[in-house]
């Protein structure tokens, strides 16, 4: 009797497959991506490598030593203090505590602050509160800290917003009116996002994370691209990450273009050049999980799409890897076996420059991804490598080589806690454990500025405030 391996369905249910069935599913998932995106197939060796990862006997797996990548985040601290019946675990805690827990306890390379109603539009009435939270976090933290939210253009339509719902207009065959409504909403999305981030950047934010770009279709992406363009023009040093909502941009409008390219129907490898053109530092491509398909099918499909996106992108790619995307099952508590296998495959086969950790409980998301493929933040040098990716648009190899040269170590040492512990204390660039007298917060970041030859926004704010 053939050996069967414990794997998952796209909804997280455990299944058992033989090696022959796994290979069949891998080929089918890969072919689906190749057909839809008109991209090359994975090589035979890559399919074999995927199968090897899936059939590894351990519950958790990880990347080979030296292949670790930085992680970024969606939903911020909501996975800790959120309690809305999804993936938040409802721990009563401040956002400062949540951010520092990711930095100090989870070993995150970067973190983000976000509002409980995680979209830019609802932030407007409480932006002063968000600015104060950002200032306090920046005074206490060392890793790059973004402000993150969803463009969420749907909030600009009735009954939540001022513009008539284009879906209702199209049902009434009022096509021109529907187009007008989407264009007006996109303009407001751009305006609001820029306004919010002007305030947050003035309060020390390292940058902005656009989470689930194009969730409301091509007009949503249109508004977001113009927001990125405006922010880059006004703030040349702002860190900007643009993560997508889905693998294909829905053509709700159908006629909108950016840089002469029609947005409707774009796949990840076609989205990447436009995100870079607008001025983002990091692109977060997405591949949706099909809950009725197996994990081999979903993972091969996702890896194929992401490999093409990485090759087409001139900026680093941090693949979105929350529940329901990136080959990960659609489950609030993502199975650790599936998460770590997907994380390893994305780094070793797709060649991604980082992982954008998405929705899921703390153990299933940040802890699993960081254990599988992360650089462990301040425990080693993950925060430094992440800063170079965002400061200079460096892909993973270049960023690691740059930081290693500055530290006078080998690139493999950048994820070595033993090497980096002593070095961080010696250079006074912040250590993860509490050491009396060691530089913390702004002081540590000022030393990082000198070490890496970069400017850090919260340090600039501090310098302006001193007399």
UniProtKB/Swiss-Prot annotation:
Enzymatic reactions: Co(I)-[dimethylamine-specific corrinoid protein] + dimethylamine + H(+) = methyl-Co(III)-[dimethylamine-specific corrinoid protein] + methylamine
GO biological process: methanogenesis; methylation
Main enzyme class: transferase
Source organism superkingdom: Archaea
Presence of the UniProt keyword Methyltransferase in the record: yes
An example molecular function term from Gene Ontology annotations: dimethylamine methyltransferase activity
E.C. code: 2.1.1.249
Pfam families noted in UniProt: Dimeth_Pyl (PF09505)
Pathway where it operates: One-carbon metabolism; methanogenesis from dimethylamine
Keywords: Methanogenesis, Methyltransferase, Pyrrolysine, Transferase
Family affiliation: Belongs to the dimethylamine methyltransferase family.
Known function: Catalyzes the transfer of a methyl group from dimethylamine to the corrinoid cofactor of MtbC.
Protein name as annotated: Dimethylamine methyltransferase MtbB2
